[in-house]
């Protein structure tokens, strides 16, 4: 059952992060943006399908001029709204966040990708003083995203620990979510993590005194710590800035095994019930790893990672999809 729809409103962003899964850009000639009327319709259809959360992302969602109207619409429909953002911490950004809060925004998730951005940080405030001002006199929640790649691995422990120590006394702070790097978008295979680095991440989590402030999620099931059920093509949908609905963030803009449809031509329900989404749900069951003692926790790993790692061109896309899902995670810890 659908619970959350993420909408990449635009690919416009000033940060130019080297790991960006959406190939976000500031180049005028390459900018893409979703039509406001199409997005509004998708939000209304999400409500009819029982979804309770809309996530606005990008690119940088603050660069979408009519974002305030979309947040207000989401709130009036009785759904929660979240933005994934990495805007520079300036007075202009502060005012935009405060406007969205006044219109019903529920949560801000801010990126900790400072070390992965190629652009000069023109932020005026540090994170603490900035977010103290953002969350003054409201009940909004703040989360952070830290994408763990080979390029950001060296700063992982200090970055996560310092963030938690700094913000855990703030009532508005939720958690730091560790995002497993996927070699797609701008990200390249040489940025992928080794098994040794994955084990170090496991030890970091297990040795932390603030586990309740760290979110791992399904892609980290391979570490054998806990199982978080995979919700690909089921509880979640991602609308790309190209209008296509994708089953998961891990395989955004990957269309070699099927396309669900496009919001310019299809309803949300049609895309959710498309052959592509339906096959993913059907194949996401017990597979060749089911006899492994780690299977109850690992569940053979991340479907998106498996598809990207194991895809080979074939005329039979359904069979190829099944083979990829039935394979082991490329970073299987066995």
Predicted segment positions?
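Glycine-centered loop/turn positions within well-structured domains
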Residues: 15, 246, 300
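Conserved phosphate-coordination/catalytic loops
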Residues: 33-37, 121-125, 283
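Flexible mid-to-C-terminal extensions adjoining Fe-S/redox cofactors in radical SAM and related proteins
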Residues: 1, 23, 252-334
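Flexible loop residues that form catalytic
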Residues: 25, 59, 113, 181, ...
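Radical SAM enzyme [4Fe-4S]-AdoMet core and its adjacent flexible, acidic
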Residues: 29, 80, 99-246, 250-260, ...
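Conserved alpha-helical substructure of the radical SAM core
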Residues: 1-107
